């Protein structure tokens, strides 16, 4: 049996401020740092270890992974960073307060932008100071690859491309893998692994910094999945307590 651990980064400063974050490189809040330490302690207590780790190029996911591995005495584990594991790009909404945006555009419209799978928010323009194309971490991207906005389908496409090319082969070769990433990135993976319908993924929420374990067969088909706590598996249907959506 193959085990895969997914973890959404701890609470970020913009989670705390209720802002759309997307590709903006925001760090963890104090609560987020504490959540990451707790996640590492949970994994260590439950006897987990890893051979390889994957994360995005955004510091909130990177720092969460560093802290988790440090708490587990696994700082030596190879870490692979890739922009394809970044959060969904929220376009012109990035940096805006979610409540204020709902007041401006209407709650229904903002709900559609956030939760539908195929509707993109308004795009950034290339002259917008939030446009990240010139950031050195993205120098390998061609202009047509760089998003100005994304829907969940767009996010899923790049996430699964990286899954099939890099992560799945490692799992099939017997490596113990952890992925530290973002809410919509993990939603995309869960949608794929569990073969969720569009309606099923709309209501799917991923809590911050609580390990989500997938047990997979040799073809990487899920046998079952569960969240972990200090006491072991969280019973089916119970939502972990600290959640930042």
UniProtKB/Swiss-Prot annotation:
- Which keywords accompany this UniProt record? Gluconeogenesis, Glycolysis, Isomerase
What the entry lists under SMART domains is as follows: PGAM
- The answer to whether the entry has keyword Aminoacyl-tRNA synthetase is no
The entry's active site is: 9 (tele-phosphohistidine intermediate), 87 (proton donor/acceptor)
Which InterPro entries does the entry mention?
Answer: His_Pase_superF_clade-1, His_PPase_superfam, PG/BPGM_mutase_AS, Phosphogly_mut1
Q: Which domain of life is it from?
A: Bacteria
The EC number of this protein is 5.4.2.11
Q: Which reaction does it catalyse?
A: (2R)-2-phosphoglycerate = (2R)-3-phosphoglycerate
Site (described: Transition state stabilizer): 182
State a single Gene Ontology molecular function.
phosphoglycerate mutase activity
Pathway-wise, it operates in: Carbohydrate degradation; glycolysis; pyruvate from D-glyceraldehyde 3-phosphate: step 3/5
> Which Gene3D superfamilies does the record match to this protein?
Phosphoglycerate mutase-like
Binding positions (substrate): 8-15, 21-22, 60, 87-90, 98, 114-115, 183-184
So what does this one do? Answer: Catalyzes the interconversion of 2-phosphoglycerate and 3-phosphoglycerate.
Q: Which family does it belong to?
A: Belongs to the phosphoglycerate mutase family. BPG-dependent PGAM subfamily.
Protein name, please? 2,3-bisphosphoglycerate-dependent phosphoglycerate mutase
């Amino acid at each position: 049996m193959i085990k895969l651990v997914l973890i959404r980064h701890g609470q970020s400063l913009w989670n705390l401020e209720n802002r759309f974050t997307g590709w903006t490189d925001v760090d963890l809040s104090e609560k987020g740092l504490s959540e990451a330490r707790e996640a590492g302690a949970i994994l260590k207590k439950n006897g987990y270890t890893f051979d390889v780790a994957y994360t995005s190029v955004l510091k909130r996911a990177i720092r969460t992974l560093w802290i988790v591995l440090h708490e587990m005495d696994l700082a030596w584990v190879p870490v692979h960073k890739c922009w394809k594991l970044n959060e969904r790009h929220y376009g012109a909404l990035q940096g805006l307060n979610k409540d204020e945006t709902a007041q401006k555009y209407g709650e229904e419209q903002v709900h559609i932008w956030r939760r539908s799978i195929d509707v993109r928010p308004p795009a950034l323009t290339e002259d917008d100071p939030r446009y990240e194309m010139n950031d050195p971490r993205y120098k390998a991207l061609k202009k047509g690859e760089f998003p100005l906005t994304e829907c969940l389908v767009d996010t899923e496409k790049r996430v699964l491309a990286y899954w099939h090319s890099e992560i799945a082969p490692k799992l099939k070769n017997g490596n113990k893998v952890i992925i530290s990433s973002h809410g919509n990135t993990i939603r995309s993976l869960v949608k794929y692994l569990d073969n969720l319908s569009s309606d099923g993924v709309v209501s799917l929420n991923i809590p911050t910094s609580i390990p989500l374990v997938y047990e997979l067969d040799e073809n990487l088909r899920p046998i079952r999945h569960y969240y972990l706590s200090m006491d072991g598996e969280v019973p089916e249907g119970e939502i972990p307590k600290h959640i930042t959506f």
